């Protein structure tokens, strides 16, 4: 009979992870189950950094950014011997089920543990929104709000000084942060991984905006496209006539209090995860589709192709080009 549930967060942190942790703890305790936190992800698991917690632990964490139980990356977890050690530790603690919050790598670890006898449920915790089995990942909403606020602030000062700002945002190989925040922030040019503009194209477009006498320009780009955005800024400046500066937002996108939407989604998914565990089901990835919380086998979730954002990007890009070409 199931008596104990474990929780770990793995990989890069994201806002809303603590709301998911709180959701697991509160739901499990309401069902009469003990909850155990595992410090620092899979690294903590193989080192037996496991602690029992109660509802008091969950009471004040939903508003906090990051993950209060810590996270770490552990490439060695792919090793079958390391996986076996993790299973042995969980079984010794009589923890028969685990909620894993993280990205693709965390999902793969959860799948392997499920195959070895520990029922695992995975929740999509990453600001990048690159878990294809879920419309939105935990932390994405907060991240794009942070980026929009940064764009707003940069626009103020660029407008004051008649300048151009290039803003590089996170996303790994997914352009959703740049696309969503760029559109919401009123960017003039957006370059994402699947619709990447060349450095020369960006410089030429900024030059056209200068010719159209636009007072300020905001360019939003995804990371991992351009080797050095500061050098890109120098190129843009040399070709456009604008003094141009680059801002790399970096890890500011992963910190701070989660938005209401991230807390809400994370808590809902956590509740659903515990319900699946109580039903005796493991090896599932939880996500959202529209307003619905859904579950899929982890391996199926990992195999879903990413939906293209090219059409959304193209409509926005064409609209902006029409505006400044007619100016």
UniProtKB/Swiss-Prot annotation:
Cofactor(s) the record lists: Mg(2+)
Catalytic reactions on record: beta-D-fructose 6-phosphate + ATP = beta-D-fructose 1,6-bisphosphate + ADP + H(+)
Pathway(s) this gene product operates in, as recorded in its UniProt entry: Carbohydrate degradation; glycolysis; D-glyceraldehyde 3-phosphate and glycerone phosphate from D-glucose: step 3/4
Magnesium found in the keyword field: yes
Domain of life the protein comes from: Bacteria
Residues annotated as binding Mg(2+): 104
GO cellular component assignments: 6-phosphofructokinase complex
Binding site for ADP: 155, 186-188, 214-216
Record text on activity regulation: Allosterically activated by ADP and other diphosphonucleosides, and allosterically inhibited by phosphoenolpyruvate.
This enzyme's EC code(s): 2.7.1.11
This protein's record includes keyword Magnesium: yes
Subcellular compartments: Cytoplasm
List of residues binding ATP: 12, 73-74, 103-106
One record GO biological process: fructose 6-phosphate metabolic process
UniProt entry keywords in alphabetical sequence: Allosteric enzyme, ATP-binding, Cytoplasm, Glycolysis, Kinase, Magnesium, Metal-binding, Nucleotide-binding, Transferase
Binding site for substrate: 126-128, 163, 170-172, 223, 245, 251-254
List of catalytic residues: 128 (proton acceptor)
GO molecular function terms listed in the Swiss-Prot or TrEMBL record: 6-phosphofructokinase activity; AMP binding; ATP binding; fructose-6-phosphate binding; identical protein binding; metal ion binding; monosaccharide binding
InterPro entries: ATP_PFK, ATP_PFK_prok-type, PFKA_ATP_prok, Phosphofructokinase_CS, Phosphofructokinase_dom, PKF_sf
Subunit structure of this chain's protein: Homotetramer.
Family under the similarity heading: Belongs to the phosphofructokinase type A (PFKA) family. ATP-dependent PFK group I subfamily. Prokaryotic clade 'B1' sub-subfamily.
PANTHER family: ATP-DEPENDENT 6-PHOSPHOFRUCTOKINASE (PTHR13697:SF4), PHOSPHOFRUCTOKINASE (PTHR13697)
Function: Catalyzes the phosphorylation of D-fructose 6-phosphate to fructose 1,6-bisphosphate by ATP, the first committing step of glycolysis.
Protein name, entry field: ATP-dependent 6-phosphofructokinase
Organism per entry: Spiroplasma citri
Gene: pfkA
């Amino acid at each position: 009979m199931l008596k104990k549930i474990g929780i770990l967060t793995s990989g890069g942190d994201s806002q809303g992870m603590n709301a998911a942790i709180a959701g697991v703890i509160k739901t499990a305790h309401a069902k009469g189950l003990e909850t155990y936190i595992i410090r620092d992800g899979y690294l903590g698991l193989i080192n037996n950094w496991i602690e029992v917690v109660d509802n008091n632990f969950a009471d004040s964490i939903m508003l906090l950014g990051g993950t209060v139980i810590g996270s770490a990356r552990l490439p060695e977890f792919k090793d079958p011997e390391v996986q076996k050690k993790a299973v042995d530790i969980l079984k010794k603690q009589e923890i028969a089920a685990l909620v894993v919050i993280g990205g693709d790598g965390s999902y793969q670890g959860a799948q392997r543990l499920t195959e070895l006898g520990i029922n695992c449920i995975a929740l999509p915790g990453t600001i990048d929104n690159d878990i294809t089995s879920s419309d939105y990942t935990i932390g994405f909403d907060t991240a794009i709000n942070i980026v929009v606020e940064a764009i707003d602030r940069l626009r103020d000062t660029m407008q004051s000084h008649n300048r151009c700002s290039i803003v590089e945002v996170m996303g790994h190989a997914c352009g959703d942060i740049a696309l969503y925040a760029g559109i919401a922030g009123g960017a003039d040019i957006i370059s994402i991984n699947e619709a990447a503009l060349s450095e020369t194209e960006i410089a030429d477009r900024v030059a056209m905006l200068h010719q159209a006498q636009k007072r300020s320009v905001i360019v939003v780009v995804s990371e991992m496209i351009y080797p050095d955005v500061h050098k890109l800024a120098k190129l843009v400046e040399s070709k456009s006539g604008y003094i141009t500066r680059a801002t790399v937002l970096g890890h500011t996108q992963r910190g701070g209090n989660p938005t209401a939407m991230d807390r809400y989604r994370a808590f809902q998914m956590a509740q659903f995860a515990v319900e699946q565990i109580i039903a005796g089901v493991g090896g599932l990835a939880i996500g959202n589709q529209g307003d619905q919380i859904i579950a899929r086998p982890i391996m199926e979730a990992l195999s879903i192709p990413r939906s293209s954002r090219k059409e959304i990007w193209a409509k926005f890009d064409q609209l902006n080009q029409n505006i400044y070409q007619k100016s």
